[in-house]
């Protein structure tokens, strides 16, 4: 799936949170591939910058906050501290 397809699934409030979180992790993988780093580097950056652990239980609004940060990384509007 593409980043855009995964983004839509993260935003789809009809899906279970666990499913949406899985798609958020897939978005992190797309960002990692674009930046040439491992997925865990991106997931750690999300946790550091937003306080949201994509591996743990999350709320819907947290997924959207994490997604916004992933979008910023993807578009070069935010930087990794790697």
Report each predicted region and the residues it spans:
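Alpha-helical propensity feature that highlights long, continuous alpha-helices across diverse contexts
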Residues: 1-82
């Amino acid at each position: 799936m593409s980043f855009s397809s995964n983004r839509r699934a993260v935003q789809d409030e009809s899906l279970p949170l666990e499913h949406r979180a899985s798609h958020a992790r897939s978005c992190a993988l797309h960002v990692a591939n674009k930046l040439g780093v491992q997925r865990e580097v991106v997931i750690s950056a999300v946790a550091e910058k937003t306080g949201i652990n994509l591996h743990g239980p999350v709320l819907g609004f947290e997924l959207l906050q994490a997604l916004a940060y992933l979008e910023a990384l993807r578009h070069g509007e935010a930087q990794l501290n790697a």
